[in-house]
């Protein structure tokens, strides 16, 4: 694996339990978790680099897409911040030249019990289904990777009902 794409969300970041912790407009709640998101992404990068990865592209994929602090990431990384209004959305920058995808901070789908931050793409969607099944962002973005022939290597995700997700 020489070239890795990392898509990073925040709602599945360790310790998050409230929407305020995901919102830049509430800095006394948000700042800690934005730093935690950055630490988790940095850890994924360090592990990939130690395993021989030479090119790491990170897509900050939460809300404003300005959550990860690039200054706290290893020098050998590149980060896409903000939104390009591209159909790949949270996967912007991914193409068939990548050897793999890693997801950090992902979460369960809208309508899944057990996670107070469950949603799919935005809180306006009551649910999103693919072939009749509730589809979390992880599934939708894995399908984008699959369509390009890029395998998913790792997902750091909060799953409220693993058996339902694994039955996909």
Q: Which residues are covered by each model-predicted region?
A:
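Glycine-rich nucleotide/cofactor/substrate-binding loop typically near the N-terminus or early
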Residues: 15-20, 40-96
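N-terminal glycine-rich phosphate/adenylate-binding segment common to multiple enzyme folds
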Residues: 81-124
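Active-site glycine-rich loop that binds ribose-phosphate moieties when present
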Residues: 85, 122-148, 157
């Amino acid at each position: 694996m020489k070239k890795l794409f990392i898509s990073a969300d925040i709602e599945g970041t360790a310790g998050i339990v409230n929407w305020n912790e995901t919102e830049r407009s509430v800095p006394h709640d948000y700042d800690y978790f934005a730093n935690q998101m950055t630490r988790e992404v940095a850890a994924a990068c360090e592990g990939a680099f130690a395993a021989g990865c030479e090119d790491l592209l990170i897509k900050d994929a939460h809300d404003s897409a300005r959550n990860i602090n690039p200054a706290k990431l290893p020098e050998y990384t590149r980060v896409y911040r903000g939104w390009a209004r591209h159909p790949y959305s949270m996967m912007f920058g991914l193409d068939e030249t990548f050897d793999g995808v890693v997801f950090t901070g992902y979460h369960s789908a809208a309508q899944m019990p057990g996670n107070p931050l469950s949603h799919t793409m935005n809180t306006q969607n009551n649910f999103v289904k693919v072939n009749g099944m509730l589809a979390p962002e992880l599934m939708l973005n894995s399908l984008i990777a699959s369509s390009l022939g890029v395998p998913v290597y790792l997902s750091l995700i909060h799953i409220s009902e693993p058996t339902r997700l694994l039955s996909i």
